[in-house]
């Protein structure tokens, strides 16, 4: 995969020997004749519908996932809504994990009722209960692995068996692991979503998402994207392709740092629980070890009940390497605090009672 990310999507011999593809900033694409225009002879017809710049990134990401194709979205959340709305319609029912990303939960709660789409949330650690939630109009199961906040690893093999049994579509947010550590297509998932904003871009300076699929699923996603007018800046595409070139190296360092730090935090008496699937004590460690090739740099910790939020704030404010802010996947380390137990848009199978801190380790030296 290191070789693929280094070379796919570029053809310097078609570009005056220049390794990086050019950035095409355009809306209009000109035809030589009216006959050519009417017959749509050109490969590219309008800037929003694709250019050589977007084609380079589409080809590259599709290759690392061994997918037939993909569409680019303006953000990770736009990729999620694109994946959802291309698979379900008015009158359908969908199942989502209880620990799903807060913005995805909010979209379901606020938009699905308006669109006459029914939904239920399931506990990703209780798949027997998942099967009882399936209705006659259920069309799809949405997955995250691990869960966004408390890092539950779902048994994807069992979920795929359920999907096959009831003829359901499946889609998954794979931002945490990327194709480097986990390829959902190997398990039969229909649609894979990733926030390019995070690891692929890797520099915390652009926002973008991607939705990958095969066959009819890809056709549906491409149709929705075109009808919804989804568009991504060519400059952002260029920077994402730049980030993709070093993805395996950055992910390896981020992963190394996170596991080292997680093991260190396991031995801190003020810490009650380290939510990192690569740790042997994690409830889903065996599932992670079975399905994943590695762990990314994002995890969380819960402090003991007697540790106050003020004390954790003081600790966070004193850190020199870690920035305080949302998002993750870039080259620098970040921390953020969330009230997981009381948020309207965050629900988890494990509810932390102590102060919760989410940690992302970047590319720094672990000894610093």
Q: What annotation goes with each model-predicted range?
A:
Residues 1-51, 59, 357-359:
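N-terminal "arm"/small-domain region of PLP-dependent enzymes with the aminotransferase-like
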Residues 5-7, 11, 70-268, 275:
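Conserved PLP-enzyme active-site core in the AAT-like
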Residues 28-29, 213-217, 244, 303-307:
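Short loop segments at secondary-structure junctions
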Residues 28-78, 103-110:
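Conserved N-terminal alpha-helix of the aminotransferase class I/II PLP-enzyme fold
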Residues 29-35, 217, 340-343:
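Active-site/binding-pocket entry motifs
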Residues 109, 118-120, 131-132, 136-139, ...:
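PLP-dependent enzyme catalytic core of the Aspartate aminotransferase-like
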Residues 240-249, 297-305, 358-362:
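Short, well-ordered beta-strand elements within core beta-sheets of diverse protein domains
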Residues 259-320, 324-331, 340-350:
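Conserved small-domain helix->loop->beta segment predominantly found in fold-type I
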């Amino acid at each position: 995969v290191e070789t693929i990310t280094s070379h796919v999507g570029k053809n310097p011999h078609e570009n005056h020997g220049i390794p990086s593809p050019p950035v095409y900033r355009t809306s209009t694409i000109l035809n030589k004749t009216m006959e050519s225009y009417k017959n749509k002879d050109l490969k590219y017809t309008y800037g929003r519908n694709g250019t050589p710049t977007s084609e380079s990134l589409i080809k590259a990401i599709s290759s690392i996932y061994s997918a037939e194709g993909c569409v680019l979205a303006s953000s990770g959340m736009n990729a999620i809504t694109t994946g959802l709305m291309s698979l379900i319609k008015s009158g359908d029912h969908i199942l989502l994990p209880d620990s799903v990303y807060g913005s995805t939960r909010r979209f379901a709660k606020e938009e699905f009722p308006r669109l006459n789409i029914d939904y239920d949330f399931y506990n990703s650690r209780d798949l027997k209960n998942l099967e009882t939630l399936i209705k006659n109009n259920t069309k799809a199961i949405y997955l995250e692995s691990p869960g966004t906040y408390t890092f539950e690893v779902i048994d994807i093999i069992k979920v795929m068996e359920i999907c096959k049994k009831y003829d359901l579509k499946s889609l998954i947010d794979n931002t945490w692991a990327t194709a480097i550590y986990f390829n959902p297509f190997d398990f039969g998932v229909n649609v894979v979503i990733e926030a390019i904003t995070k690891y692929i871009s890797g520099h915390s300076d652009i926002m973008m998402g991607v939705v990958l699929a095969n066959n009819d699923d890809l056709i549906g996603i491409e149709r929705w994207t075109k009808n919804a007018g989804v568009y991504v800046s060519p400059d952002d595409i260029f920077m994402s392709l730049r980030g993709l070139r070093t993805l395996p190296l950055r992910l390896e360092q981020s992963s190394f740092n996170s596991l080292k730090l997680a093991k260190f935090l396991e031995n801190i008496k003020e810490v009650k629980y380290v939510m990192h699937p690569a740790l042997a004590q994690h409830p889903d460690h065996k599932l992670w070890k079975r399905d994943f090739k590695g762990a990314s740099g994002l995890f969380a910790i819960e402090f003991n009940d007697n540790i106050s939020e003020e004390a954790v704030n003081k600790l966070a404010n004193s850190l020199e390497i870690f920035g305080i802010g949302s998002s993750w996947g870039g080259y620098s380390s970040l921390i953020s605090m969330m009230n997981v137990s009381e948020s309207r848009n965050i629900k988890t199978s494990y509810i932390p009672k102590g102060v919760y801190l989410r940690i992302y380790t970047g590319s720094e030296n672990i000894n610093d």
